[in-house]
Amino acid sequence: MTSSENLDSHRLRLDVVTIFPEYLDPLRHALLGKAIEDGILEVGVHDLRNWATGGHKAVDDTPYGGGPGMVMKPEVWGPALDDVAAGRVSGAELDSASLHLKNVRHDELGGVEKRAYVVEEDRDLPLLLVPTPAGKPFTQADAQAWSNEEHIVFACGRYEGIDQRVIDDAANRYRVREVSIGDYVLIGGEVAVLVIAEAVVRLIPGVLGNRRSHEEDSFSDGLLEGPSYTKPRTWRGLDVPEVLFSGNHAKVDRWRRDQALLRTQAIRPELIDASLLDSTDLKVLGLDK
């Protein structure tokens, strides 16, 4: 049985509006490319300049009130989002960069557990994600929720961003989320799209194959993931922890939990919620006093 014969019926459509369509080529590679090939994922990339007018196909103009930089024009973005929401355009449909069908991962052979689509009140509207430093921080919880979506549209801003009226008006046709991937500024939204798309798509049943691969990820249980090891047993004088060879699954699980707790305490202590920890967890962290 191939992985594609064992999949849930859920499919995701991604549409990306950008002035640099070639920037999205990485979506054709690796596991996302395989998801496209397996029919789990569809990706359409739309050049914003197709909606621009005039000889220069300008998509930006000077900001009202003065100040540096340029602002992306509403009369270009508005029609673009209208058409994408209505399915009136067919951008460059991305295909897989290389064939993957004969390269089934060993952890896909065990099958994929199905997951129901999460129904929301406004589920008939596509989800519009606008990457911006001013947006709400993107989290693993967002990725998990959005992996249940059927249609996500990304609006990639550049320069000083998109005229705010575009975002406000889009709420008539979309569920709009302005989202940030970190407290720093990028040149444009395309990099953020690659980050969000990969985080979301990998959670769709059939993409990773082994459901435990993402259940044990960092942040999936509120903690950072602990260290991982593979062959050889000793490398450059460094040994793999003995507990991993014990064959005692309970001890291995406890060790991994302890490592996740200690790593989180050292690197991201703000993620630890003592109210969610049991007595053993608290003892590991020295919080049982």
Curated annotation (Swiss-Prot):
The keyword Methyltransferase applies. Keywords: Cytoplasm, Methyltransferase, S-adenosyl-L-methionine, Transferase, tRNA processing. S-adenosyl-L-methionine binds at residues 157, 181-186. It catalyses: guanosine(37) in tRNA + S-adenosyl-L-methionine = N(1)-methylguanosine(37) in tRNA + S-adenosyl-L-homocysteine + H(+). GO terms for molecular function: tRNA (guanine(37)-N1)-methyltransferase activity. Its main location: cytoplasm. It comes from the Bacteria. Residues 90-123 are annotated as: Insert. GO terms for biological process: tRNA N1-guanine methylation. GO terms for cellular component: cytosol. SUPFAM superfamilies: alpha/beta knot. It is found in: Cytoplasm. It holds the Pfam family tRNA_m1G_MT. InterPro entries: Alpha/beta_knot_MTases, tRNA_m1G_MeTrfase_C_sf, tRNA_m1G_MeTrfase_TrmD, tRNA_m1G_MTases_N, tRNA_MeTrfase_TRMD/TRM10. Its EC number is 2.1.1.228. Belongs to the RNA methyltransferase TrmD family. NCBIfam families: PRK00026.1. Specifically methylates guanosine-37 in various tRNAs. Homodimer. This is tRNA (guanine-N(1)-)-methyltransferase. It comes from Corynebacterium glutamicum (strain ATCC 13032 / DSM 20300 / JCM 1318 / BCRC 11384 / CCUG 27702 / LMG 3730 / NBRC 12168 / NCIMB 10025 / NRRL B-2784 / 534). The gene is trmD.
